[in-house]
């Protein structure tokens, strides 16, 4: 579960693992894109922990993608 206070790379790893477990192809790419959508920046460049709103948005996007909703529909 993605929570407020998580560091960006830890959040992306968590999302990637969940997507992989759900059978989503390209889970690493999808996790990075979902982070970018939720946080508004690239996880590789971000260094501040996730805020509450960012974490909630990333969690919601992850749940939708894990349910196999196409990434393009989430953008």
Briefly describe each language-model feature range.
Residues 1-26:
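Non-catalytic nucleic-acid substrate-recognition regions in nucleic-acid-modifying enzymes
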Residues 28, 33-75:
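Conserved AdoMet
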């Amino acid at each position: 579960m993605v929570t407020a206070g998580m560091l960006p790379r830890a959040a992306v790893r968590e999302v990637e693992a969940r997507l992989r477990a759900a059978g989503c192809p390209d889970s690493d790419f999808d996790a990075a894109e979902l982070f970018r959508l939720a946080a508004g920046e690239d996880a590789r460049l971000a260094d501040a922990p996730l805020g509450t709103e960012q974490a909630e948005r990333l969690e919601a996007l992850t749940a939708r993608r894990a349910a196999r909703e196409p990434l393009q529909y989430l953008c």
